[in-house]
Amino acid sequence: METDKSAALRSGYAPESIDPAFLDALTSDLAAHLNVAVEQIWYWRSHLDVFIGDYLHFKLFDTQQVIARAIGNCSDVALALCRGYGKTWLLAVCAVALAILWPGSRIAVVSKTAGQANLLIDKIVNELLPNADIEREIDYSTGKGSKVNMSGRSAVYFKGGSSIRSYVLGFGGDNVLGIRDLR
């Protein structure tokens, strides 16, 4: 009785019969593609607005593009925008983009009340998750995905190990719940 391996050896399609020159060309071609992919990721990291348009397929207005790029390039961003501008939506999209582009990152949403802190997570779960590009990045395999725990905090977990978590600052900053999770 002939096994699959012996049939492959007989037919000449076994790994032992691959031309070394072909392997060298394949390896160099793969390395070139990997370098292009790394360059693209670094470009997207410094041009967050382009990533949001190219990968997440959201159309941003010009002012939103400027804000998204500032969020991608600065450690601190202060926004003073009018009512109805879409601040929460824009920050949710930017937080998701940062979580995808920087695997293993922990993004904290800190607010005075639990309702305000969970608002951004709710925006991600209810409005952004129907987007197939974002849903593909959410980690459902561990059962985490998105959840709200008993203290009113909520979180979204990504396949790259990133997470977006909400924290309640409280009055005067004395009762930050779960501050040890930020480390």
Residue positions per predicted region:
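Phosphate/NTP-binding elements of NTP-utilizing enzymes
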Residues: E2-R183
